[in-house]
Each structure stands twice: as structure tokens, then as C-alpha cells.
């Protein structure tokens, strides 16, 4: 039986997180708070006016882009900062000022972490596969909720960082397998082995390279990978979550791809975008929200 495809998109907001806030936005930038640090980063879609322009000049860290591929440099108002601890629920991890304007995680993903937490806590020690796991926050959130996690990323450095975050969280002994591998190759081997999972998470980049030079292109490679992931879902599987950052994509297109991959599993497909919202009215202007990522998720019920 085909899954039921939601006819309306959802906008999922990151809320109630003491270690993160979107303070203001406008003039192609966003002002955020990470722990005790205020950070100003480019955000071209914020073409409205800031609510408090003077606050932009007081940021602790400012990212200056050098090219269209998001590379650039950080400026600091005081002593340069490399990394700093943050927390979300039971998970602890390091934010880091990377040369690619982000801080080694993506705060809008907290809406997905919250959803995963609820799904996993309703299950009995489910096996969860996290592909393109990066620095491991989603893997740690899943493990904290009770899952046995397999974390896969093509970058040895990212996997080492994820393991450091596990130690920081006091989860060094948690049931997490750390795998450095190309996601497509790993999933293909798992299909041949007959492995099964109750939940799978995918957060692929638009473009990337595997540990031995494999090239990943989202639009060319995602359909086959998602089909293989659907084959890894056990009979009692609970979810398959796909997230993507790409200008030429939409939540609806991801939903149709998900429907194709899960065509015989029943259940439901929800889709939409992840967004950050300014945390409160300021200077007479209500909070604005910034859509940053698209998602589609299949759930058994």
C-alpha cells in the first residue's frame, strides 16, 4: 500500500533552546546567539531591514565571505575563539568557527532532533542509521533517546569530532558505531548483508567526496540511495527522514522522491522546511522566520 502524502507543507521552527537564539536579521545578514557568543553571518534571503541595526556592530564574531562557495574568514571583537561548548537536551557538543560560515552544526536541525527524540522514545532500543552524520549531534540525540546508532560519514575528521562530542556528552560508552565510509557504498553493503533498521536519517550535501575520492552529487545520486535505504527498513520500522540543503529543490520534490522509495510501505509522508525564527518582538517589529532547509519524512503511523 502506498503511503499517504500530506497535501500541505509544514514549517518546523527551532524553539525553546537556551543555548541558541536568532536575535535579529536583515540587510542580508542574521545575528545569532550561540551560548554566550553573538555571531553575525551572511544570509542573502534576509532582504528586509534589521530591527536593531546597531546590535550588528556589537557581535562577538563576524563572518566575511570571500567567494560564492561560502568560504571566508571570521573576525572577532575580542580574543579569537576556536570552539566552545553547547548543549541540547542531554547532548553536549562543540560549536566551532569553521571557514565555511557555519559553526559545525546547523541550529535549524533542532526541530528534527526533537521529532526524532519523540519517535525513538516510543520504541524499544531501535536500530538507527545516520548517514552523512557530520559532527554527530543527531546521532547523539538518537542515542540519548534510547537508540542503537550507526553513524556514517565520509570524513575521518568529522567522525573523530563526533566521537569527541560523544565524550563531551558523557556518552563515550553509548551504543554508537562510528563508520568512516562513502554512504552509498556502506548502504549497498548493508543491503547485501540483509541488515535492517527501525529508523534511518539522511542529511546529504549538495556535493561531496568520499574517503577514497568518490564523488557525491545530490540530484544524480539521491534517488538510488534513498531506494536502498527503504530496502534497509525492517518490517517494524518507524521512520525514514531526509533533509537537504539545495537552492534547486523543495520539500515537495523530496516528498515525491520519498513516496517513490516507500511506495509499498503504507504509513505517511510529511514534508516542508526547517526554519529559524527571531525569538521576540523588537522595536515594534514582530519576529521574522528564515527558511533554511527542506525535509521529507516517512513514518509508519
Kindly give the residue locations of the regions a language model identified:
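Conserved alpha-helix/loop element of class I SAM-dependent methyltransferases that forms part
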Residues: 107-124
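Conserved class I S-adenosyl-L-methionine
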Residues: 124-134
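Conserved SAM-binding loop of SAM-dependent methyltransferases across substrates and taxa
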Residues: 135-147
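Conserved SAM-binding motif I beta-strand of class I
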Residues: 148-153
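S-adenosylmethionine
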Residues: 183-261
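C-terminal catalytic and target-recognition region of SAM-dependent MTase-like enzymes
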Residues: 237-301
Amino acid at each position: 500500500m502506498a503511503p499517504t502524502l500530506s497535501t500541505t507543507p509544514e514549517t518546523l521552527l527551532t524553539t525553546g533552546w537556551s543555548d541558541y537564539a536568532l536575535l535579529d536579521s536583515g540587510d542580508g545578514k542574521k545575528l545569532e546567539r550561540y551560548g554566550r557568543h553573538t555571531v553575525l553571518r551572511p544570509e542573502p534571503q534576509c532582504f528586509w531591514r534589521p530591527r536593531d541595526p546597531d546590535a550588528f556592530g556589537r557581535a562577538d564574531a563576524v563572518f566575511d565571505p570571500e567567494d560564492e562557495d561560502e568560504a571566508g574568514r571570521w573576525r572577532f571583537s575580542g580574543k579569537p575563539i576556536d570552539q566552545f561548548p553547547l548543549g541540547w537536551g542531554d547532548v553536549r557538543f562543540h560549536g566551532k568557527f569553521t571557514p565555511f560560515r557555519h559553526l559545525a552544526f546547523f541550529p535549524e536541525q533542532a526541530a528534527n532532533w526533537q521529532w526524532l527524540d519523540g519517535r525513538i522514545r516510543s520504541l524499544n532500543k531501535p536500530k538507527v542509521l545516520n548517514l552523512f552524520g557530520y559532527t554527530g549531534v543527531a546521532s547523539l540525540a538518537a542515542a540519548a533517546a534510547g537508540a542503537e546508532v550507526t553513524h556514517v560519514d565520509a570524513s575521518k575528521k568529522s567522525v573523530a569530532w563526533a566521537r569527541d562530542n560523544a565524550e563531551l556528552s558523557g556518552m563515550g560508552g553509548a551504543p554508537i558505531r562510528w563508520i568512516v565510509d562513502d554512504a552509498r557504498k556502506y548502504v549497498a553493503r548493508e543491503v547485501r548483508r540483509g541488515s535492517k533498521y527501525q529508523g534511518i536519517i539522511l542529511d546529504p550535501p549538495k556535493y561531496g567526496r568520499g574517503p577514497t575520492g568518490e564523488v557525491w552529487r545530490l540530484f544524480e545520486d539521491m534517488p538510488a540511495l534513498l531506494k536502498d535505504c527503504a530496502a534497509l527498513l525492517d518490517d517494524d520500522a518507524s521512520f525514514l527522514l531526509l533533509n537537504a540543503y539545495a537552492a534547486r529543490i523543495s520539500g515537495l520534490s523530496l516528498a515525491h522522491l520519498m513516496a517513490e522509495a516507500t511506495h509499498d510501505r503504507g504509513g505517511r509522508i510529511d514534508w516542508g522546511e526547517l526554519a529559524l525564527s527571531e525569538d521576540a518582538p523588537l522595536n515594534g517589529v514582530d519576529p521574522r522566520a528564515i527558511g533554511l532547509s527542506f525535509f521529507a519524512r516517512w513514518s509508519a503511523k
